[in-house]
Amino acid sequence: MISFGLLLTFATLATWLQPAAANAQDAAQIARGAYLARVGDCVACHTSRRDQPFAGGLPMETPFGTIYSTNITPDLRHGIGSYSYDDFAAALRKGVAKDGHLLYPAMPYPSFSKVSDTDTRALYAYFMHGVRPIDQPNPQTRLHFPFNLRVMLTGWNLLFRPAGAYRADPAQGAAWNRGAYLVQGLAHCGACHTPHGVMGEEKAFDARGTDLYLSGYTLAGWHAPDLRAGHGTGERSRDSIVQLLRTGRSHGSATFGGMSEVVENSTQYFSDADLHAVADYLGSLHPDRAPPTPAAAPPVKPDATTALRSGVTPTGGALLYLDNCNACHRSDGSGAMKAFPALAGNAVVTSDDPSSVIHVILTGSRMPSTRSDPAPLAMPAFGWRLSDPQVAELATFVRSSWGNRGSPVNAADVAKVRQQVDPAQLKRIRAAVTNEVTDDGAPGPTGK
C-alpha cells in the first residue's frame, strides 16, 4: 500500500513537472528568438510606427521603385500567423511566401539563407509567441516595369542567391566562425557594405575568392564604408569595433545615418561574446590589393588649426567651418570624446566617395541612444541654408585639413546627393529653425 502511494505521488509529480519543463524550454527558445531578431534588426525594416512593431508598411526607396515592408506579426489576416515552421523557413531563407509568391531581395534572404535550422526555429517561436499580433494591411509595392513582374525573381534567384547554410572554416577558431556566421548571415552586413550589381545583387556573400565583400557601397546618398582591415573603418582596433557597435561611439569617431539605427535597434544588444566574435572576424579580412594612394589634397595655408584660432581664414571653406562647425569639432578637428566625433584622421571624412560627409552636412546626423550612452546627441542640418558650392567648399576644407588627404568636392557632387534627399525633409528643418510654415501647413515650433 505504501509502495502504491509512493508510485502515485511520483506519477503526479512527473505529470506536474513535464509541462513546467516544457514551458521553461519554450520560454528559453522564445527568448533566444527575441535575441536573434535583434541581431537581424528585423524591427528596422518591418516597423513604420513605433507603437506597432513588426507590422510593416515602411517604404524603402530603391533604384527600381518603392518596396513596402510586410507585416510579420502573428496576425492571421495580414501577418504570418498562419505560417507553419516550414512556411516561415522558406520565407526567411529562400524568399518564398506561404502562397508561393517570391519576395523581393530588399528582404535579405540571400544572407538569411546561411541561418541554421536551430536559429530559424527560435526565430519562429519568437514571432509566433513573443510578438503581439497587429491587424495592419500590407501596402502595395510599386516597382517600375519590368521589375514589378515577380516572375523575374526566379531567374534572379538562380543567378544570385547563395546555396546552403553557413559553412564553418575548419582552419579558424570557434569565435571567428561565430563572427563570420553573424556578419554573413543574420546581421547581413553585406547588404549595405558590399558593392551591388546592376540587378541589385550583392557581388559577394563572403570573402572566399573575391576582393569585394564588405569593400563599401553607396546607395541613396550614403556611403557605407569598407569594413576590411587596413581600409577605412577597418583600420580601427578590435576593441574599438566592439565599442562602436555597443555604443555608436569610439575614440574619435561615431556612427551616422542608417548605422546609428543599427546600433540603437540591434548591435548594442549583442552579447559580449558575439561582439568580440564579430570584431575578430572583421579584423581578419584583408583585401588582396593594397589600399589606393590617397589623392593629393589642395593645400590649406596657413595650417588649418593656426588659421582658425588666429581668425585668419584664407578660404571660404575655412570661414564656413568657423561659422558652423568649430564650436563642436574644434579648431584642430579633434572633436570631443563621446560627444562630437573627430574630423581629423576620420576615415569616413576622407573616404574616396564623399557622399556620406556631404549627406551629413546637408541633413545632419544623430548618434544612437544606447544603454551606456542614452543621450542621442545630434548634429544640425545645414542643407536648408547652405548652397551646393558652399557645402562643397566646407566639405573640401574638412577633407583637406589637419593632415586629411581627401580629394576635393565640387558643387556637382553636392547636387547629386541633394537630389536624393527628400525636399520636404529640408523644408521641415528650415521651418523648425526659422518658425516658418511649410507647404503642407506644418509650422515651426512656435509658428502660428
State the predicted function of each range.
Residues G56, T70-D75:
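N-terminal post-signal-peptidase region of extra-cytosolic proteins
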Residues D75-G95, F112, A180, P195-H196, ...:
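A structural feature that tracks compact, well-ordered secondary-structure segments
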Residues S3-Q18:
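Bacterial N-terminal signal peptides
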